Amino acid sequence: MGLSGDSPTRMERVKGMNKKTEELEEIIGYHFKNKHYLTQALTHSSYANEKKLGKLGCNERLEFLGDAVLELISSDFLYAKFTQVPEGELTKKRASLVCEPSLAYCAREFGLPQFLLLGKGEDMTGGRNRDSIVSDATEALLGAIYLDGGFASAKEFVLNFILNDIEHKQLFYDSKTILQEMVQAKYKETLVYELLKEEGPDHNKSFEVCVKIGDEEIGRGLGRTKKAAEQVAAYHGICKIQ
């Protein structure tokens, strides 16, 4: 017991986890009064099952709460920022800014995936890079901040890490729609997306796509799904022709 070479004790694992959560707190600029909220926000159901924590031991309830908080904050933000935009357009903007790929992108920007607690099998099959898992954890983290620090703290997190640089993010996540409208207005040629490469096992694929106006290639993109790769290609296409 406690000899060199032994597996880490429970206390050592707890200390290691505390150090990781403290690092995340520094990154997001919010320090939890109740650390349990943060730990639970990072706990995926696969880890909870593996550690026999029960159905309530994972982040799904916090995700449910965070989703509602995010909808309110993003709606309030867009209502105040775009005073001349009708309801339908505001709904579209909100949907593009808080959709699964967008939340996953935002989370990766501040390094959330490295802090997630996943079951060994889920981790080995690429779960840490899966948009659905990362975006769900982002909502769970928001829910945890809301419970621990209230609406003001939750709003500050959203404004700093999700709704920051809104023009660039909207351009990126609406790229296919924006490019289609640009091509229809300026060109007589048809916009075409072409799959160039598909690599990797089913659980961790990579796609490369190019977009063309007629026969002329205007952009390429890489992504973990074909749709994501098309968005990246469209973004580069916009940058080239605008």
Predicted feature locations:
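Double-stranded RNA-binding/processing signature
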Residues: M1-Q242
